[in-house]
Amino acid sequence: SDSARAKLSQEVLQTLVAENADIIAIQETKLSAKGPTKKHLEILEELFPGYENTWRSSQEPARKGYAGTMFLYKKELTPTISFPEIGAPSTMDLEGRIITLEFDEFFVTQVYTPNAGDGLKRLEERQVWDVKYAEYLAELDKEKPVLATGDYNVAHNEIDLANPASNRRSPG
């Protein structure tokens, strides 16, 4: 596609390839419950041939094709992978929002934090989520250091927003 969004997506992918990172965390994958399609996997293999992937998608009764997270990590790395449930409200634990990689000396975890929703309809649930996720990180940190990555759905400054003017009063 020649759209600006498609061009930007290609630029982001090329930047990720050029960075040659050991671990790449991706949020809001919106994959089906079955995960990446054959085509998705072919593209990942083409762009990131030296990487393994692990993913977590939204599972019923949560919404289909919603949220989701994925890690790409170099094949020589051998983490223990977990998909923790943190006791979040409603279906949030089933929305594919957290993946944790455990290594000998540390954890790498990623999150796609739920937003508070239009009209702040999920604000109370979001506040419970924040407490539960903080407790989860604290438990990991008791064992070994934690690198916590992801989309926290918080915009501290205008630079954190793609469109600051239109998002000024939007929930995170």
Where are these regions (language model features)?
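Class I S-adenosyl-L-methionine
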Residues: 51-60, 87-89
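N-terminal, active-site-proximal structural segment of metallo-dependent hydrolase catalytic domains
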Residues: 1-45, 55-66
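Conserved beta strand-loop-helix elements of the APE1-like EEP
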Residues: 63-81
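Short amphipathic alpha-helical surface micro-motifs
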Residues: 35-37, 50-52, 91-92
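Residues that flank catalytic or metal-binding motifs in active/ligand-binding sites
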Residues: 49, 66-68, 97, 104
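Active-site regions of metal-assisted phosphoester/phosphodiester hydrolases
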Residues: 11, 75-172
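Structured helix-beta-strand junction loops
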Residues: 19-20, 47-51, 104, 143-144
